[in-house]
């Protein structure tokens, strides 16, 4: 087992009982793969598959002109080089995008030629706007801010059958319906009404009998009846009627006459119900025809029309009822055989026949007209319009598309693979005629498709078949970034197509080129709108690495084409059994979106159709193999799947006689030999955030939900600290989120400082002729979207050997490459003077003093200088009537220095704006003329620090418009950036040269020369001393006798000069980017951004939380000496209320505290050993005991060298980190074993701590009195987070501020500098106390009495404290409102 560079330094002891069969997949794969499939940027144009952009283009092109003489074909597209990299885009507020160019071919046909001949062909590349690119971490940079496109969970296209659950009709009758949902196009619904007529509707419009649709499709009534019915045959004689007997059809009927066999024996007596036994008897007796009374025939419907053969007169139409008069007519016309429809009330309803009766439309064309009138009411139906509309509804590829998914789902549901025994004969006939349908097929509907849906719906009504469950994940699919972007792109292209069609006719005559035809505006605006302001495109939650990852793995049911919050019921939001392993049942927001926004489970991924699938281990011959299959929710229901915690023996066979398993989405116990699959991991069912909660299995689900959500709000602390009790997935999350820096290639660290790491790559990993250097520029003090601080710190030293993928620098909230959201705090569960009442948290002053929860927040403040009508605004230091103290920290350009500490109200950037001219008196004009311009016509509009903010200036950026001269500060910033870049290139060049000259030395040392510099003679050998005496570039002048070596020397010289040329061009490119003007909004000349770093210590009012949903607000910070302390004098860091645990049922926190206590105890033991300068062997033995002599995963301590063991021990002094994976973690016995190892009974420290029974509770002493508390207290270490709800951001007080326009009352909210609302109930309170003066003041001068409040101000200034209350403005508003209702209301003043 090999450990990475950082793992060696800190091993996590894992309590996992099961070997991991499959690694957790790359967590951002879904986003990256989806967008890569959309762009196909790295695939050559001729090898691209028909997905994404390629599919969008090929679905819209070719575009043919109306006359058909010109057409525009799509050849290929390519994405250019992005002009700026991600970092530059973020700084300049640009979109990180690449230009899209499309090669199109314009073909013009010769109009005059008799047969089609091509007149000319023009091919050209057309620019189609910019396509945003995804950063390597799965986000997009749009206008300088990072955004995420959230995947959408929507109803899969296909056909769905459901019923109304008896809610529509008062009788509670189930009304069945079917709905065909295409990917794009019109919805087609079929539904029964309470009278059992079958209707259809298009796009939820007015309903019409389904037979109208069938007639419009070209079916006659006879064909319709033949499709949906079996026939009964009757032979009509002069006397009596004979019936061809099909015994099966009589089952359950009551015999209306005696049924006799050939010998005249009674099989079924009259008025008896016919049973299965009777049917068997009839089949045995072999009767084929029986004579029946005429009443038996009356009332049945004819299967086909009947024509008098002699006269040609129509006697009866299809579906007519047989009456006595009709029978007489038939006998007259000599008709001796008729077919009637076989129907009964039980399982062969006559719905279609009844529906045909209420439909009075005679033929196909009239049916189409009826549909046209329903779709376009009030428009005159011309023949072309009618046909075009009907064809366009479901049969035109441009208008209607089921998509591959839709077709697959449709065929699976409407055409069953195997026909069941109970299927009716007419349906069996239909399926045999159509034949089996695979998963592929056209995107439009065919007549057979529509018939199949009606047939399945009728069978449902007949009581055969099941309805669909809409919330089943086999019926809901994921639309990821790529697909959403493709839809937007296609929509833009369709708009382009319309315009191009118009212009193509011009192209025939005007000799236009392709780029004259195509206007790319609609495409680029559709894309811009999608990425900039659509619902799926969200401002990335960047509080900490976990919130980034979770945001990218989010799946939302909201958005265009999805649900809305108001309409979504309970069923959609509920956890469904198919969520198992696909969507997390825990992590979802609290509030109106609960259940509509979900998170992907750890191992889940989407298949080619967009359905979520989850991995399972295959079980063959009772043996669990390591072969893994991904199953979607549709496939999963057919298998028996065992849970991951089933006990297995050495060979991978199940130990128990009964295994807990799932079959058909139900949980059951099954025999091992019936099991076909097994879960891959116990944590398979939860999401990333939930899998970070240790002992999740001991927490109530509601609290786990809060815990998962609150981890995403944890603010990165100044010094991150790994959790003592983790779940083992922390490293994966940190690495996959992209916050830490990982080595791209293996190598040796050549140079490290706080902002860059230079690695000399191993020769075997560097490609030939390539620069063997990796330079990692670290992100320093950068603002995240949530104003938290992103800062990377190197973990390596010069000379360290790295492998590919090793973590070499920590980012925000990571510690040695592991996610570290909070701090480990020594916690006691006890009440303390009421300060932890109702979840309040009491913390020690030491926590503040050690800066444990100090976080840095970065605020961006910007100011723009515009060109106004009165003249340009100016950024300057020269501002009148500002004291020198205010201007003291501005440089000569008027911009504050970096490093200045500023308070609210301080000037950051001086700016003046021209004021409007005032009319001058002649005297003033004269003075003006003499003394020149006065400074009074500008007003001070400087950028100041907003109220309630203070901090240190850490960065300033100046952007200047093209063509405007830069000030000294802007020039200096550019010079600094260039110097940094030059340093990078110089380092690269230095290492490349060192490497190259090292190779040259090895190549030519000891070789025979034929001459060279410093009088090297022919035949002399080249020595090391000789080479050292030469300048390195002179080595190339040495002439060697060995031609092969000489050639290699030549090659090295060429590659070196090539590298130098490349570096020079890179530098020039960078210089060009920096010195060209910046793109600024119109009218803006200059923009200055100032970044302030604000240090926030923890203080009362801040919100803190554990990982188990145990949240609270800091109530008091207590001096260290007053905190409860242990017998050895260790004071507590945090005191929590024990009443917060039992009712909330999150016991996980107690177990975490116990295990954390053990972790710290072990750390102290290791620390003591180091202090006593123990030998490496002794440390190794102890580590073996900790890691391998207990339950859980064993670690390979033997593979570490002695130095590595000591290094590891040093890092373990603060506590041995544990991993307790979800559902597979430490048991009570494991925790006790660890506590015994941490606090052995013979250790003096154990005796000193005065443990109660067990080692989880100790006697605590009151810091104020020194007395012991009367009962033992649970203490231990808990990982506690500080959440992004800081009192500094919420605290706010209003002095005189803005007022609302109409009511003249103060505004509300911190952003508006508003006041606190004094509402109706507060007024009642004052009334109840009889505080009349306070009440008057509240309702008048403090609120909306305009004259009164100015009066009060005057009085206070004069020093009189008196109030003259007037008329509140809201009363005037009320009067005006009443007057608007035409009621004249006035105040009578006496």
Curated annotation (Swiss-Prot):
Catalytic reaction list: RNA(n) + a ribonucleoside 5'-triphosphate = RNA(n+1) + diphosphate
Source organism, top-level taxon: Bacteria
One Pfam entry name: RNA_pol_Rpb2_2
GO BP, sorted A to Z: DNA-templated transcription
Enzyme kind, highest EC tier: transferase
GO MF annotation: an example: ribonucleoside binding
Assembly information from the UniProt record: The RNAP catalytic core consists of 2 alpha, 1 beta, 1 beta' and 1 omega subunit. When a sigma factor is associated with the core the holoenzyme is formed, which can initiate transcription.
Protein task: DNA-dependent RNA polymerase catalyzes the transcription of DNA into RNA using the four ribonucleoside triphosphates as substrates.
Family, as annotated: Belongs to the RNA polymerase beta chain family.
Record's protein name: DNA-directed RNA polymerase subunit beta
Lineage start: Bacteria, Pseudomonadati, Pseudomonadota, Betaproteobacteria, Nitrosomonadales
């Amino acid at each position: 087992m090999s450990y990475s560079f950082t793992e060696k330094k800190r091993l996590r002891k894992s309590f996992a009982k099961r070997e991991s069969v499959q690694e957790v997949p790359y967590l951002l794969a879904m986003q990256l793969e989806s967008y890569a499939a959309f762009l196909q940027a790295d695939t050559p144009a001729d090898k691209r598959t028909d997905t994404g952009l390629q599919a969008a283009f090929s679905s819209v092109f070719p575009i043919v002109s109306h006359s058909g003489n010109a057409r525009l074909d799509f050849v290929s597209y390519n994405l250019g080089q992005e002009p700026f990299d991600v970092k530059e885009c973020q700084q300049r507020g640009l979109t990180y995008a690449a230009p899209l160019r499309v090669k199109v071919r314009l073909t013009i046909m010769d109009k005059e030629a008799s047969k089609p001949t091509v007149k000319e062909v023009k091919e050209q590349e057309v620019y189609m706007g910019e396509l945003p690119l995804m950063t390597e971490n799965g986000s997009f940079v749009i206008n300088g801010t990072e955004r995420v496109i959230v995947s959408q969970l929507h109803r899969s296209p296909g056909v769905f059958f459901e019923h109304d659950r008896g809610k529509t009709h008062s009788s509670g009758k189930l009304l069945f319906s079917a709905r065909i949902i295409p990917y794009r196009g019109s919805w087609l619904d079929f539904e029964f009404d309470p009278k059992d007529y079958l209707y259809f509707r298009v796009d939820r419009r007015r309903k019409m009998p389904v037979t109208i649709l069938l007639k419009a499709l070209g079916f006659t009534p006879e064909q319709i009846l033949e499709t949906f019915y079996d026939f009964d045959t009757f032979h009509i004689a002069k006397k009596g009627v004979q019936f061809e007997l099909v015994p099966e059809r009589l089952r359950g009927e009551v015999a209306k006459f005696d049924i006799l066999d050939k010998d005249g024996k009674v099989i079924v007596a009259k008025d008896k119900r016919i049973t299965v036994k009777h049917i068997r008897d009839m089949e045995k007796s072999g009767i084929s025809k029986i004579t029946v009374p005429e009443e038996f025939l009356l009332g049945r419907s004819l299967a086909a029309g009947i024509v008098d053969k002699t006269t040609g007169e129509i006697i009866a139409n299809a579906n007519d009822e047989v009456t006595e008069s009709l029978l007489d007519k038939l006998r007259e016309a000599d008709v001796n055989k008729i077919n009637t429809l076989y129907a009964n009330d039980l399982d062969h309803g006559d719905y279609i026949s009844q529906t045909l009766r209420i439909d009075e439309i005679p033929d196909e064309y009239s049916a189409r007209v009826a549909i046209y009138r329903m779709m376009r009411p009030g428009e005159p139906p011309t023949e072309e319009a009618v046909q075009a509309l009907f064809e366009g509804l479901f049969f035109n590829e441009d208008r209607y598309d089921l998509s591959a998914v839709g077709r697959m789902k449709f065929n699976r549901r409407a055409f069953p693979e195997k026909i069941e025994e109970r299927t009716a004969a007419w349906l069996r006939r239909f399926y045999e005629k159509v034949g089996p349908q695979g998963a592929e097929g056209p995107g439009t509907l065919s007549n057979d498709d529509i018939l199949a849906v009606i047939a399945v719906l009728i069978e449902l009504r007949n009581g055969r078949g099941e309805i669909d469950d809409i919330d089943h994940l086999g019926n809901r699919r994921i639309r990821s970034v790529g697909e959403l972007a493709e839809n937007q792109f296609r929509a833009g292209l369709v708009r382009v197509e319309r315009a191009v069609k118009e212009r193509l006719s011009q192209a025939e005559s005007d000799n236009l080129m392709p780029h004259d035809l195509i206007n790319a505006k609609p495409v680029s605006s559709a894309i811009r709108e999608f990425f900039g302001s659509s619902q799926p495109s969200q401002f990335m939650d960047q509080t900490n690495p976990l919130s980034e990852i979770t945001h990218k793995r989010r799946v939302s049911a909201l958005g265009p084409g999805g649900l809305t919050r108001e309409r979504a019921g309970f069923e959609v939001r509920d956890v469904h059994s198919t969520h198992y392993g696909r969507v997390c049942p825990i992590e979802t927001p609290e509030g109106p979106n609960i259940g509509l926004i979900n998170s992907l489970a750890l191992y889940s991924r989407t298949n080619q159709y967009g359905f979520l699938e989850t991995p399972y281990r295959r079980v063959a011959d009772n043996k669990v193999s390591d072969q893994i299959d991904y199953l979607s929710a549709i496939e999963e229901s057919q298998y028996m799947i065992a849970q991951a915690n089933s006990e297995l023996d050495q060979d991978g066979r199940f130990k128990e006689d009964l295994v807990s398993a799932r079959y058909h989405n139900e949980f059951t116990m099954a025999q091992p030999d019936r099991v076909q699959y097994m879960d891959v991991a116990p944590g398979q069912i939860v999401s990333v955030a939930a899998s970070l909660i240790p002992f999740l299995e001991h927490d109530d689900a509601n609290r786990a939900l809060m815990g998962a959500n609150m981890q995403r709000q944890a603010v990165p602390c100044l010094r991150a600290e790994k959790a003592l009790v983790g779940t083992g997935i922390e490293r994966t999350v940190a690495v996959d989120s992209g916050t830490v820096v990982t080595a791209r290639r293996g190598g040796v660290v050549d140079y490290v400082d706080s902002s860059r790491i230079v690695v000399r790559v191993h020769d075997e990993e560097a490609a030939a002729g390539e620069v063997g250097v990796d330079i990692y520029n670290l992100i320093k003090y950068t603002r995240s979207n949530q104003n938290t601080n992103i800062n990377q710190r190197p973990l390596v030293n010069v000379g360290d050997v790295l492998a590919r993928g090793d973590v070499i620098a920590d980012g925000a909230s990571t510690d040695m490459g592991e996610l570290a959201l909070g701090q480990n705090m020594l916690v006691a569960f006890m009440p303390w003077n009421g300060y932890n009442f109702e979840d309040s948290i009491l913390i020690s002053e030491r926590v503040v003093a050690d800066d444990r929860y100090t976080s840095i927040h970065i605020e961006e403040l910007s100011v723009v200088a515009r060109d106004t009508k009165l003249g340009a605004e100016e950024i300057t230091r020269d501002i009148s009537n500002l004291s020198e103290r205010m201007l003291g920290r501005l440089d000569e350009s008027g911009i504050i220095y970096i490093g200045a500490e500023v308070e609210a109200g301080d000037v950051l950037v001086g700016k003046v704006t021209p004021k409007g001219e005032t009319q001058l008196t002649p005297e003033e004009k004269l003075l003006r003329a003499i003394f020149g311009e006065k400074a009074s016509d500008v007003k001070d509009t400087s950028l100041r620090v907003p109220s309630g903010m203070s901090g240190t200036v850490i960065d300033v950026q100046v952007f200047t418009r093209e063509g405007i001269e830069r000030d000294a500060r802007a020039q200096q910033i550019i010079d600094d950036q260039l110097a940094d870049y030059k340093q990078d290139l110089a380092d690269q060049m230095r290492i490349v040269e060192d490497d190259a000259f090292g190779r040259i030395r090895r190549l030519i040392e000891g070789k025979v020369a034929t001459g060279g510099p410093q009088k090297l003679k022919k035949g002399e050998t080249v020595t090391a001393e000789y080479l050292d005496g030469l300048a390195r570039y002179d080595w190339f002048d040495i002439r060697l006798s060995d031609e092969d070596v000489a050639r290699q020397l030549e090659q090295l010289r060429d590659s070196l000069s090539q590298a130098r040329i490349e570096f020079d061009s890179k530098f020039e490119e960078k210089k060009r980017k920096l010195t060209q003007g910046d793109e600024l909004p119109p009218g803006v000349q200059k923009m200055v951004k100032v970044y302030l770093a604000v240090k926030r210590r923890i203080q009362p009012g801040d919100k803190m939380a554990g990982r188990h949903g145990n949240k609270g607000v800091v109530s008091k910070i207590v001096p260290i000496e007053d905190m409860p302390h242990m017998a050895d004098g260790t004071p507590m860091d945090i005191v929590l209320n024990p009443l917060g645990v039992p009712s909330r049922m999150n016991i996980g926190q107690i177990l975490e505290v116990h295990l954390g206590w053990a972790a710290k105890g072990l750390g102290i033991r290791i620390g003591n050993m180091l202090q006593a300068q123990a030998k490496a062997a002794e440390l190794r033995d102890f580590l073996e005991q900790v890691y391998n002599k207990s339950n859980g995963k064993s670690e390979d301590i033997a593979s570490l060298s002695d130095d590595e063991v000591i290094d590891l021990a040093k890092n373990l002094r603060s506590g041995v980190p544990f991993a307790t994976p979800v559902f597979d973690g430490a048991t009570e016995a494991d925790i006790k074993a660890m506590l015994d190892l941490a606090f052995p009974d013979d250790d003096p420290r154990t005796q000193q701590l005065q443990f109660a029974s067990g080692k989880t509770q100790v006697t605590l002493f009151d810091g104020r009195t020194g007395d012991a508390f009367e009962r033992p207290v649970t203490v231990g270490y808990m990982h506690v987070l500080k959440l992004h709800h800081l009192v500094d951001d919420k605290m706010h007080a209003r002095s005189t501020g803005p007022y609302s326009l109409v009511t003249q009352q103060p505004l509300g909210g911190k952003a508006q500098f508003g006041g606190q609302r004094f509402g109706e109930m507060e007024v009642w309170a004052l009334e109840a106390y009889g505080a009349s003066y306070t009440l008057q003041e509240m309702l008048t001068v403090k609120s909306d009495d305009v004259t009164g409040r100015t009066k009060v101000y005057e009085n206070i200034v004069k020093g009189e404290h008196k109030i003259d209350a007037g008329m509140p403005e809201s009363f005037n508003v009320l009067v005006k409102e009443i007057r608007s209702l035409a009621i004249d209301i006035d105040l009578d003043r006496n």
